[in-house]
Amino acid sequence: MSKLNLEKKLKIVKEAKKLNIKKSTYLANKYDISVDTVESLVNRFEAFRIEGLINKEKKPYYSAKLKLKIVLYKLETNHSYDEVAKKFNIIYSSTIAGWVKKYREYGFLGLNNNIGRPKKIMKNPNKKPAKIKKSQVKINNDQQIKELKEQVEYYKLEAEFWKKFHTLLTKEKSTRKKQK
């Protein structure tokens, strides 16, 4: 499978539109790509036009709050990843799938961005750490306060999620009872 440039992607989408199909084994074989890739290209073009086909050099940044909002929307509405991606203007639906997986494994903390290089561990155990200045203590306290506020926000959102989840369950149970 070769990496597709923008011209090739547009050509594939144009041919798929001409044939009036989204999935095509003919196009997949012709361009040596998977059928799912053909479908993905057509869907991204329909949703975002040419912008959906352009490879970004830099990944877009999404805040943890936005990720949580999108994940909760996905879990509450049970829409497909593609539908949720269209609603929130996220080009790749697999991005949302990754967020949902992280949320299920680690909760809200799994949605935080770990950008950059991880901190180095002190290699020499005999080396003493530098003395901490008062200004650094203030910064550490401010950082700790910020982290605690984020935790409070997380627990509020989590409580809200479980309340909504509970109401959905009770609605579902009542509809099942009515059907019987």
UniProtKB/Swiss-Prot annotation:
| InterPro entries xrefs | Homeodomain-like_sf (IPR009057), InsJ-like_HTH (IPR055247), IS150/IS1296_orfA-like (IPR052057), WH-like_DNA-bd_sf (IPR036388)
- What SUPFAM superfamilies does its record include? Homeodomain-like
Secreted as UniProt keyword: no
The reply on keyword Cell membrane is: no
- Key words, A-Z: Transposable element
Q: Quote the Gene3D superfamilies the UniProt record gives.
A: Winged helix-like DNA-binding domain superfamily/Winged helix DNA-binding domain
Query: Which family does the similarity line name?
Result: Belongs to the IS150/IS1296 orfA family.
Q: PANTHER family attached here?
A: INSERTION ELEMENT IS150 PROTEIN INSJ (PTHR33795:SF1)
Tell me what this protein is called: Insertion element IS1296 uncharacterized 21.4 kDa protein
Q: Which organism is it from?
A: Mycoplasma mycoides subsp. mycoides SC
